[in-house]
Amino acid sequence: MREPVVPGQGQCWGGRNYKFDSAEQQQWMELMGAKGWTAPDWPTEYGGGGLDKLQHKILKEEMARINARSPLDSFGIWMIGPALLEFGSEALKQQHLPPIVRGEIRWCQGYSEPGSGSDLAGLQAKGEDRGDHFIANGQKVWTSYADKADWMFCLLRTDPEAKKQMGISLVLFDMRTPGVTPKPILLISGNSPFCETFLDDVRVEKDQVVGEVNKGWTIAKYLLTHEREMIGSMGMTSPASETLGQIAARTFGIEQGRMNNPMLRAEVAKWEIDGACFALTAERVTDEIKSGSGVGATSAMLKYYGTELNKRRFETLLKIAGSDGVVWDGEDSKGGWLPRTWLRTKGNSIEGGTSEIQLNVIAKNILGLG
């Protein structure tokens, strides 16, 4: 679990139906999950590692020192888990958090709709009150890996008479529930990480509501903060990820071809400097958010700069690759991972709130403009 991770490959997502790349990948996830180190700073009573801030930092540094891969990539750990810790009932925490830590359940997010993307509060998917449960009807879109997920955390309008940002509830349901139909969306990259998800008379138990009924908007915004941090972190180099210079050396050779170009070398160096600065900033901001001392809009800053940094990374990689960077098929192209991932990064600055929206948030809440 110390081999370099090719972008878009090599991650471990877990879940009921997940097919591991190797026995070593499965063992790594299971061992780390058993210690709670897939979620090191979560409380031990919910399966986490129970580490304090300093211990968590030391663990990350040691993982980086041995060049270890992340044992588990999970919307459960990144998004719904923190929301449950903050707003969930004790029963929901006990039910959902330990399986997330162990990688047994894979989650997806039911937020965006065909007419409600950036204007999330305008969502139309409804949850009709039937006493001890809701009946959900509507459509979600851009639902990442809904066809592979086990559970969904989903926003429903449970009070159609309330004001736009009121009457919304955050609910949880099993993707095997009758009436849930995910349909993959084929992207220009040739991959299908997103789905349309149709809800037709889906029964959602009221004990699966996070927080209070009709008061899910506050939780939704909290979740969006974590989503933007997650998407923004795409611009960072993880412990087992290669830097641009390392990829260039391994794939093309530093002392030959395009890497002899001093302007291209300077571009690679500039990206690595910016990437290191971003990683340090992200660590500082994350610590501030966890301690409650950070500015609420800093997640917008991380999301904006991180996604732009990630797009720059693959633009530079294409320059390094030259004509090899446009090969989609063939033994040496590894399934065309470079052009496919380059195309995929174009969506980074749209998903989770466009770059334009993030800049408006930064201008208003950090710079005090307008």
Predicted regions span which residues?
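A structural signal for short hydrophobic beta-strand segments in well-ordered beta-sheet cores
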Residues: 125-128
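Glycine-rich beta->alpha junctions and the first turn(s) of the following alpha-helix
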Residues: 180-280, 348, 364
